[in-house]
Amino acid sequence: MSTATYDLVLSGVIYDGTGAKPFEGYVGVTGETITYVGKEKITGKENIAAPAISAGFIDIHTHSDLSMALDGRCESKLFQGVTTDVSGNCAFGPVPINRERMAEHTAHLQGMDFTGGGYQESDISWSDLDGYRATLEKRGIAQNNAP
Protein backbone atom coordinates (compact mmCIF):
# COMPACT_ATOMS: atom_id res chain seq x y z
CA MET A 1 0.00 0.00 0.00
CA SER A 2 1.27 3.44 -0.95
CA THR A 3 2.27 5.82 1.84
CA ALA A 4 1.58 8.94 -0.25
CA THR A 5 -1.12 11.25 1.07
CA TYR A 6 -3.90 12.19 -1.32
CA ASP A 7 -6.61 14.78 -0.81
CA LEU A 8 -9.17 12.60 -2.57
CA VAL A 9 -9.18 8.93 -3.55
CA LEU A 10 -11.77 7.39 -5.85
CA SER A 11 -12.05 3.62 -6.04
CA GLY A 12 -14.02 1.72 -8.65
CA VAL A 13 -13.92 0.43 -12.20
CA ILE A 14 -11.58 2.72 -14.17
CA TYR A 15 -12.16 3.48 -17.85
CA ASP A 16 -8.95 5.28 -18.74
CA GLY A 17 -9.86 6.43 -22.25
CA THR A 18 -6.97 4.62 -23.95
CA GLY A 19 -9.06 1.75 -25.29
CA ALA A 20 -7.65 -0.64 -22.68
CA LYS A 21 -10.04 -2.88 -20.79
CA PRO A 22 -11.56 -1.30 -17.69
CA PHE A 23 -10.01 -2.38 -14.39
CA GLU A 24 -10.73 -2.16 -10.66
CA GLY A 25 -8.45 0.46 -9.23
CA TYR A 26 -7.82 3.76 -7.54
CA VAL A 27 -7.44 7.39 -8.61
CA GLY A 28 -5.55 9.72 -6.28
CA VAL A 29 -5.99 13.48 -6.44
CA THR A 30 -3.68 16.02 -4.82
CA GLY A 31 -4.94 19.59 -4.98
CA GLU A 32 -6.52 19.86 -8.42
CA THR A 33 -4.22 17.30 -10.06
CA ILE A 34 -4.67 13.57 -10.64
CA THR A 35 -1.44 12.16 -9.23
CA TYR A 36 -2.13 8.42 -9.23
CA VAL A 37 -4.06 5.93 -11.35
CA GLY A 38 -3.50 2.26 -10.69
CA LYS A 39 -4.44 -1.00 -8.99
CA GLU A 40 -2.44 -0.54 -5.78
CA LYS A 41 -4.72 0.36 -2.88
CA ILE A 42 -4.29 3.95 -1.71
CA THR A 43 -6.09 6.09 0.84
CA GLY A 44 -6.68 9.79 1.18
CA LYS A 45 -8.19 12.47 3.35
CA GLU A 46 -11.48 11.71 1.61
CA ASN A 47 -12.22 8.28 0.12
CA ILE A 48 -15.12 7.72 -2.27
CA ALA A 49 -16.24 4.43 -3.78
CA ALA A 50 -17.61 5.00 -7.27
CA PRO A 51 -19.26 2.48 -9.60
CA ALA A 52 -17.26 3.83 -12.55
CA ILE A 53 -14.46 6.35 -13.02
CA SER A 54 -13.50 7.91 -16.35
CA ALA A 55 -11.89 10.93 -17.87
CA GLY A 56 -14.24 13.82 -18.56
CA PHE A 57 -16.22 13.67 -21.79
CA ILE A 58 -15.96 16.19 -24.63
CA ASP A 59 -19.18 17.50 -26.19
CA ILE A 60 -18.10 18.29 -29.75
CA HIS A 61 -21.32 20.01 -30.82
CA THR A 62 -22.86 22.12 -28.12
CA HIS A 63 -25.26 25.00 -27.85
CA SER A 64 -24.29 26.02 -24.34
CA ASP A 65 -21.96 28.87 -25.30
CA LEU A 66 -24.40 31.55 -24.15
CA SER A 67 -25.61 29.73 -21.05
CA MET A 68 -21.98 29.07 -20.09
CA ALA A 69 -21.17 32.77 -20.32
CA LEU A 70 -24.22 33.79 -18.32
CA ASP A 71 -24.14 31.02 -15.69
CA GLY A 72 -20.72 29.43 -15.46
CA ARG A 73 -21.76 26.57 -13.16
CA CYS A 74 -22.44 24.35 -16.22
CA GLU A 75 -24.33 21.96 -13.95
CA SER A 76 -26.31 20.08 -16.60
CA LYS A 77 -23.11 19.20 -18.49
CA LEU A 78 -21.01 18.33 -15.44
CA PHE A 79 -23.71 16.01 -14.06
CA GLN A 80 -23.40 14.11 -17.37
CA GLY A 81 -19.60 13.90 -17.12
CA VAL A 82 -18.95 16.52 -19.81
CA THR A 83 -15.91 18.56 -18.82
CA THR A 84 -15.16 20.22 -22.18
CA ASP A 85 -17.52 21.93 -24.62
CA VAL A 86 -16.62 22.67 -28.23
CA SER A 87 -18.84 25.60 -29.11
CA GLY A 88 -19.41 28.09 -31.87
CA ASN A 89 -19.79 25.52 -34.63
CA CYS A 90 -23.28 26.63 -35.68
CA ALA A 91 -24.58 29.71 -37.38
CA PHE A 92 -26.36 30.73 -34.19
CA GLY A 93 -23.61 31.39 -31.70
CA PRO A 94 -22.61 34.24 -29.43
CA VAL A 95 -19.57 35.28 -31.46
CA PRO A 96 -19.46 37.52 -33.37
CA ILE A 97 -22.47 39.40 -32.14
CA ASN A 98 -23.52 42.94 -32.83
CA ARG A 99 -26.51 45.09 -32.01
CA GLU A 100 -28.18 44.13 -35.32
CA ARG A 101 -28.15 40.46 -34.25
CA MET A 102 -29.13 41.20 -30.66
CA ALA A 103 -32.87 41.18 -31.43
CA GLU A 104 -32.45 37.71 -32.99
CA HIS A 105 -30.69 36.43 -29.88
CA THR A 106 -33.23 38.03 -27.57
CA ALA A 107 -36.16 36.44 -29.41
CA HIS A 108 -34.51 33.01 -29.47
CA LEU A 109 -33.52 33.03 -25.80
CA GLN A 110 -36.55 34.79 -24.33
CA GLY A 111 -37.84 31.71 -22.52
CA MET A 112 -34.49 30.79 -21.02
CA ASP A 113 -33.53 31.85 -17.53
CA PHE A 114 -29.76 31.71 -17.04
CA THR A 115 -29.33 34.07 -14.14
CA GLY A 116 -32.47 33.72 -12.05
CA GLY A 117 -33.64 37.11 -13.26
CA GLY A 118 -34.36 36.19 -16.86
CA TYR A 119 -32.35 36.81 -19.99
CA GLN A 120 -31.43 40.44 -20.64
CA GLU A 121 -29.68 42.01 -23.62
CA SER A 122 -27.39 43.73 -21.14
CA ASP A 123 -26.04 40.29 -20.11
CA ILE A 124 -24.02 40.25 -23.33
CA SER A 125 -21.14 42.70 -23.09
CA TRP A 126 -18.90 41.31 -25.84
CA SER A 127 -18.93 41.50 -29.63
CA ASP A 128 -15.98 39.33 -30.67
CA LEU A 129 -14.13 36.16 -29.64
CA ASP A 130 -11.62 38.01 -27.46
CA GLY A 131 -14.46 39.70 -25.57
CA TYR A 132 -16.32 36.40 -25.18
CA ARG A 133 -13.20 34.69 -23.79
CA ALA A 134 -12.57 37.62 -21.44
CA THR A 135 -16.17 37.33 -20.19
CA LEU A 136 -15.74 33.60 -19.50
CA GLU A 137 -12.47 34.29 -17.69
CA LYS A 138 -13.94 37.13 -15.59
CA ARG A 139 -17.18 35.37 -14.66
CA GLY A 140 -15.53 31.98 -14.23
CA ILE A 141 -16.75 28.71 -15.69
CA ALA A 142 -16.73 25.22 -14.23
CA GLN A 143 -15.93 23.56 -17.58
CA ASN A 144 -13.31 23.79 -20.28
CA ASN A 145 -14.46 25.61 -23.41
CA ALA A 146 -13.03 25.43 -26.91
CA PRO A 147 -14.84 28.06 -29.00
Predicted regions and their residues:
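A generic fold-level signal
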Residues: 21-22, 52, 140
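Divalent-metal coordination cores built from histidine and acidic residues
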Residues: 70-147
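Generic low-polarity alpha-helical segments
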Residues: 14, 27-29, 47, 53, ...
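N-terminal metal-binding scaffold of metallo-dependent hydrolase/deaminase domains
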Residues: 1-43
